[in-house]
Amino acid sequence: MNLEALCKEAGLSFYDDELVSENGRKIYRIYVQKEGGVNLDDCARLSEILSPIFDVEPPVNGEYFLEVSSPGLERKLSKIEHFAKSIGELVKITTNEKEKFEAKIIAVDDENITLENLENKEKTTINFNDIKKARTFVEW
């Protein structure tokens, strides 16, 4: 099953997926994006496309709930492609060495992310494999 192609069929682009457990329920979440933003109708349309396919070829073992959603303004960055699509946005990063950064993403290549520190405007380059977790954020 090709989630990216199925999302494209619904006029959306696949962002990420995850399997979580909340209140004893297994939830399979699919995050999608679209130029101009994702609305409820977009999520419902993709869910209608996926449900009969998942009935035949389940994405996870056992009983689960399917959720289709936008990753949101403040979203997790877990793939190098996520960083590349987020150039110009603000990000909070924790490295494997427990260093913390709040910065703007200014460049991304195959394995490195270049950041501009929000306070002193210094530029720092981090190898993608050194990042433990990262999330975009919005200053209000």
UniProtKB/Swiss-Prot annotation:
Keywords, ordered alphabetically: Cytoplasm, Ribosome biogenesis
Pfam families assigned to the protein according to its UniProt record, in alphabetical order: DUF150_C (PF17384), RimP_N (PF02576)
Gene3D superfamilies: Ribosome maturation factor RimP, C-terminal domain, RimP-like superfamily, N-terminal
Subcellular locations according to the entry: Cytoplasm
InterPro entries: Ribosome_maturation_RimP (IPR003728), RimP_C (IPR028998), RimP_C_sf (IPR036847), RimP_N (IPR028989), RimP_N_sf (IPR035956)
This protein's GO CC annotations: cytosol
Swiss-Prot/TrEMBL GO biological process terms: ribosomal small subunit assembly; translation
Predominant cellular place of this UniProt entry's protein: cytoplasm
Family: Belongs to the RimP family.
Biological role: Required for maturation of 30S ribosomal subunits.
Protein name in the entry: Ribosome maturation factor RimP
Gene: rimP
